[in-house]
Each structure stands twice: as C-alpha cells, then as structure tokens.
C-alpha cells in the first residue's frame, strides 16, 4: 500500500505499528479494502466520558508519541475488524440512545463540560453536586462504560490516527450520514493527515468537526515527542476554518517539554486566526 501522503508531496509519518514480531506501516496492519469496502481495526466503540459522545477507538497511528496513553492499540495492532457499513449501523444504533441534540457549532469536547460533569450524583443520590451546571434533567443522564452523563448526537473517531489514508474516513462518514437522521461527525486528530486535498474530501463527505491536538510548536520538540515534523500541522487550523469545519485545539502541558513558551506560541497562532 503506497503512502498517500508521499503521493501528495508530503513526508511519511512515524507510523510503524507492531504485530507479533513484525512491524509495518499502520495503514498496512490496521486498514484493508475488500471489494471496494474499507475495513478498520477498532479496539472499542462506546459512549465516552467526559466527552458525552460515541467514540470509536482506532488501532494504528501515523505518530509514535512518547506520551501516548493509548499505545497498547495505537502502536500495536489490536482490535477487531469493522467495515464502514458496520460502523454506519453502530451509529444508527447509538442514535436511538441520544438524549441531547447539539447544534453543529457545539460539536466539540469542550461544550460537553457545560452540560454535565459526569459525577452521577443526580442519579445515584437524587441531588445535584456543587459543580453541576444544572442544565440537564435527570432523564437525560445515562450510564456508559466510563460513567454517567448525557449522550450527545456526535460520532467521534479517536485513538490512533491515520487520516492520511482519507478514503476510509470519507466512506465511513457517508455511511454514518446515510444511516442517521441527525448525527455530527468529529475526528480527534494530530493533524498530520490534514492536507488541503484531504480536507476537501472530508468536507465533501460530511465530516463536521476536528479536535486538533497540537503537541508542540517548535519542530525539534515536536519531532522528539512524536517522531514527525509539524510543518503542515501548524497550518491546519487555518485550512480547517477556511473550509467551515468546527475546530477545537488541544495542547498538553508536559513538564520540561511543552511548557509556557510552547503554549503561548500555539495560543498566538490561534488568536491570529480568530481574535
């Protein structure tokens, strides 16, 4: 399988993924196509907290982040095969359990925090906690594998990121939109696969929002952390907003690696786009 980034003139990612004693590129071990249908290796799929949306945890990634909390399935091929059609049916099944319908501009993780803090106090003890936003009726709160909260009308792709192989995401997005009446699609991403060409395809396929994890501003730090350049990742916010996607940016404070200087630079980048 030829690297789709290289075909577009970009550099291949740090995408070696392990399976037993062998290592291959993530797209070779966690993605396949049979009779025109794409299949993705999925570790799990469920209503997640504190995001309050249905998360699909993907195996394999184009980054090799030192701080990855999902390395057991992003850097190691681990999970079950799901076709894009099967994921579309999962989305339809989840839609029947949705308790909160969000407008498109709220298709972010951040907007989950002003709805519910996932403490479960209202369900377990019949009273709200001191930190409860006080917005939702108890009937909107459901239990998931990660705790209590609402179920928002959002399907999110998380875990490993191979958006560089955009055709899978385009096909699965179309399946989700076909199977659901009112469902938004969010991709949690490191941004490495968000080339202008790929963003055009994702927009045309029905993707609504990106949760972009900018891991560092300075390229030397980024490369040490993730194994790749961040050259076009820093351009991604502009390209995303230009195409009318919803954008949320995440940056983690990592002592001695990503501290105030890096976060200030990333903040200025965002501010220049949307003062």
Where are these regions (language model features)?
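Glycine-centered loop/turn positions within well-structured domains
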Residues: 63
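Conserved AdoMet/S-adenosylmethionine-binding subsite of the radical SAM
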Residues: 137-275
């Amino acid at each position: 399988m030829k690297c789709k980034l290289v075909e577009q003139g970009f550099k291949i990612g740090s995408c070696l993924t392990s399976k037993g004693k062998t290592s291959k590129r993530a797209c070779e071990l966690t993605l396949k196509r049979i009779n025109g249908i794409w299949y993705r290796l999925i570790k799990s799929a469920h209503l997640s907290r504190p995001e309050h949306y249905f998360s699909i945890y993907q195996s394999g990634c184009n980054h090799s982040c030192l701080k990855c909390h999902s390395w057991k399935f992003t850097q190691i091929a681990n999970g079950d095969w799901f076709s894009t059609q099967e994921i579309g049916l999962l989305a339809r099944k989840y839609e029947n359990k949705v308790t909160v319908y969000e407008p498109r501009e709220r298709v972010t993780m951040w907007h989950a925090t002003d709805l519910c803090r996932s403490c479960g106090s209202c369900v377990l003890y019949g009273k709200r906690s001191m930190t409860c936003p006080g917005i939702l009726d108890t009937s909107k709160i459901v239990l998931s594998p990660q705790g209590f909260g609402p179920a928002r009308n959002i399907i999110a792709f998380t875990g490993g990121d191979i958006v560089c192989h955009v055709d899978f995401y385009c096909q699965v997005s179309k399946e989700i939109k076909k199977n659901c009446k009112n469902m938004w699609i969010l991709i949690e991403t490191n941004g490495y696969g968000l080339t202008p060409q790929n963003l055009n395809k994702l927009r045309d396929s029905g993707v609504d929002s990106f949760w972009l994890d900018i891991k560092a501003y300075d390229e030397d730090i980024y490369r040490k952390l993730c194994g790749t350049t961040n050259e076009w990742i820093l351009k991604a916010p502009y390209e995303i907003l230009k195409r009318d996607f919803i954008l949320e940016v995440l940056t983690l404070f990592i002592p001695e690696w990503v501290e105030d200087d890096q976060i200030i630079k990333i903040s200025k980048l965002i501010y220049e786009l949307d003062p």
